Amino acid sequence: MTGTAISVCLLFLLSVCSACYISNCPIGGKRSIMDAPQRKCMSCGPGDRGRCFGPGICCGESFGCLMGSPESARCAEENYLLTPCQAGGRPCGSEGGLCASSGLCCDAESCTMDQSCLSEEEGDERGSLFDGSDSGDVILKLLRLAGLTSPHQTH
């Protein structure tokens, strides 16, 4: 064989060997998925106010978590997208889940009750009520929360 024929054969073999062998290979190759910025998971639920946590799990602060419902059916589409997504929330549970709603920890397959998802949020709300306020302001805030005074009342 001549030198050009060998070169062409080598180039052909090289191009075949560097192909991506998984069925849903991302643009840029298999390793490029690690470098890609994570996007937010698809919105779902009533009024699209939640985020997908798994193929049939939709969670939002206002409604909790919906599993296997018509509102969570849209989350199955997430499996067909080539780039990974991040649902949000802090890590919780032993299965590598994320806090999805108040007191709920979800992974891609299920949701469980988790006190760590509840305690920090409640602590943050209590702390923000009193931060930087004198006692008169604190009493007014408490009365407004109880609905006993209007927010526009002056002293």
UniProtKB/Swiss-Prot annotation:
Source superkingdom: Eukaryota
Stretches assigned to coiled coil: none
PROSITE patterns attached to this UniProt entry: NEUROHYPOPHYS_HORM
Gene Ontology MF, one: neurohypophyseal hormone activity
Family matches, as InterPro entries: Neurhyp_horm, Neurhyp_horm_dom_sf, Neurohypophysial_hormone_CS
Signal sequence residues: 1-19
Transmembrane segments: none
Cystine pairings recorded for this chain: C20-C25, C41-C85, C44-C58, C52-C75, C59-C65, C92-C105, C99-C117, C106-C111
Annotated keywords: Amidation, Cleavage on pair of basic residues, Disulfide bond, Hormone, Signal
Residues annotated with Glycine amide modification: G28
Alphabetized Pfam families for the sequence: Hormone_5
Modification(s) after translation: Seven disulfide bonds are present in neurophysin.
Any one of the GO CC terms: secretory granule
Function: Isotocin causes contraction of smooth muscles.
Family: Belongs to the vasopressin/oxytocin family.
Designated name of the protein: Isotocin-neurophysin IT 1
Species for this entry: Takifugu rubripes
Organism classification: Eukaryota, Metazoa, Chordata, Craniata, Vertebrata
